[in-house]
């Protein structure tokens, strides 16, 4: 009988956490992974805008685009964002080990990982090095199933690391409160037993900002969309106890 995908991931996490590379840093960055196993949940939008919001508080921030689709890298390519970024796709365990070494060599205050939406190296690397995992989830049943798998991986990593890390912040994403699903999302995601952060709503300003190659704080400062991101940044710092 074929094993369940979540069980497969858990086994991979165990092997990866106790693999050859040990994660040590001279001056540790705070590593925030934005991760879900399903695409279309607003992951890159959250990663880019959160990175820029954190940089606005005079903190050094590095964004690592680990998704082979390169959405974050395309956004960065316009040169209009206040953060540095690198394209470092994660496709296999070797890529995950390379990411661990790369992050350990950085001196930024924050390293944001825009993880790919598939099972494998992304979940393993996040489990090994992240201080906090943000899990964007839309108001759809498919997203809720994918979120359960991510939460299971996070808990497995906590057990193996024996440090309470990574912490988890579930972020309702692309939410439209006019719909029944949008109104019920907060209640639904609480079932995972992890901290639920402020919602990032479905707003055209995010789409327009991407088209302009800007982050929301420059494109539409003090807008409702910008408020979503500032509220998320506050929740992130609270989760990290900053």
Describe every region a protein language model picked out.
Residues 26-31, 35-41, 52-124, 210-218:
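P-loop/Walker-type NTP enzyme "switch/lid" segment
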Residues 1-33:
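Extreme N-terminal, non-catalytic leader segments
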Residues 122-141:
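Inter-motif core of Ras-like GTPase G domains
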Residues 207-230:
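Inter-lobe coupling/hinge region of RecA-like P-loop helicase motors
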Residues 46:
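Hydrophobic positions on the alpha1 helix immediately C-terminal to the Walker A/P-loop
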Residues 147-163, 173:
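Conserved C-terminal guanine-recognition region of P-loop GTPase G domains, centered on the G4
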Residues 176, 186-215:
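Beta-strand-loop-alpha "switch" segments that mediate conformational coupling across diverse proteins
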């Amino acid at each position: 009988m074929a094993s369940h995908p979540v069980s497969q991931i858990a086994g991979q996490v165990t092997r990866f956490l106790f693999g050859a590379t040990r994660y040590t840093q001279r001056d540790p960055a705070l590593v925030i992974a934005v991760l879900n196993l399903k695409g279309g949940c607003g992951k890159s939008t959250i990663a880019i805008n959160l990175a820029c919001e954190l940089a606005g508080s005079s903190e050094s921030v590095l964004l690592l685009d680990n998704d082979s689709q390169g959405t974050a890298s395309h956004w960065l390519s316009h040169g209009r964002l206040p953060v540095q970024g690198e394209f470092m796709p994660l496709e296999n365990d070797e890529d995950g080990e390379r990411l661990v070494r790369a992050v350990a060599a950085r001196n930024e205050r924050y390293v944001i990982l825009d993880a790919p939406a598939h099972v494998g190296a992304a979940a393993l690397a996040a489990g090994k090095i992240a201080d906090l995992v943000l899990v964007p989830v839309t108001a759809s049943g498919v997203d809720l199933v994918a979120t359960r798998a991510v939460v299971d991986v996070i808990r497995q990593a906590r057990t193996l690391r024996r440090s309470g890390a990574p912490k988890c912040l579930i972020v309702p994403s692309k939410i439209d409160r006019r719909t029944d699903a949008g109104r019920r999302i907060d209640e639904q995601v609480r079932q995972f037993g992890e901290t639920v952060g402020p919602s990032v709503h479905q707003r055209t300003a995010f789409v327009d900002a991407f088209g302009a190659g800007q982050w929301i704080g420059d494109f539409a400062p003090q807008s409702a969309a910008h408020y979503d991101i500032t509220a998320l940044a506050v929740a992130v710092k609270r989760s990290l106890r900053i």
